[in-house]
């Protein structure tokens, strides 16, 4: 069966009133993508090329939850994606800044350091790569994420988002994006 990927564009926790797009893609022929939220069918889209996009705008808590995509031909479900968690939260922390060393263009095999800088001593952060379902967690206290021996598969659009864990999780906005190219 074809594998389906599901991801958010742009990735990250969304603020109330914010917007994002759920992307479902697979190497499949014509058919339909059915989007499920918390096990309930919410929308169906015909396949356009190899992907379907479901937009969320003016987000509220009703948009939060566990999403998955099913690929259907007729009545047969041919494949299911992993589950994507969408969170809708107010942003209370300052916006972080993402930088990359040694630079935006690196040679294959090099080590790359992503640094997420935020004006908050106790924040932990996630590094996002567009197209990937999960963020990469930074070790708390360390805001550097090291990618060793980079390859073409590491290319893409990165961003970061930070949080504090107290009685409640508090979130920052998502940083501006940064594109990494591997030569």
Feature locations, PLM:
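Conserved Ig-like domain signature around the intradomain disulfide
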Residues: 20, 31, 62-71, 112, ...
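Short coil/turn motif common to extracellular beta-sandwich-like domains
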Residues: 11-21, 103-113
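Solvent-exposed loop segments of extracellular immunoglobulin-like
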Residues: 28-37, 118-131
């Amino acid at each position: 069966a074809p594998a389906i990927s599901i991801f958010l564009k742009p990735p990250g926790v969304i603020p109330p009133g914010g917007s994002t797009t759920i992307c479902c893609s697979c190497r499949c022929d014509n058919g339909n993508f059915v989007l499920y939220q918390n096990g309930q069918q919410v929308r169906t889209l015909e396949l356009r090329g190899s992907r379907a996009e479901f937009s969320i705008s003016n987000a509220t808590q009703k948009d939060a939850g566990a999403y998955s995509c099913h690929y259907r031909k007729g009545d047969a479900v041919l494949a299911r994606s992993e589950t994507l968690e969408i969170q809708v939260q107010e942003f209370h922390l300052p916006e972080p800044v993402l930088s990359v060393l040694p630079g935006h263009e690196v040679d294959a095999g090099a080590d790359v350091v992503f640094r997420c800088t935020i004006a908050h001593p106790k924040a932990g952060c996630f590094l996002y790569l567009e197209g990937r379902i999960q963020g990469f967690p930074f070790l708390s206290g360390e805001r550097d994420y090291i990618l060793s021996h980079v390859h073409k598969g590491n290319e893409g659009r990165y961003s970061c988002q930070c949080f504090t864990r107290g009685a409640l999780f508090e979130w920052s906005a998502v940083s501006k994006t940064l594109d990494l190219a591997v030569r």
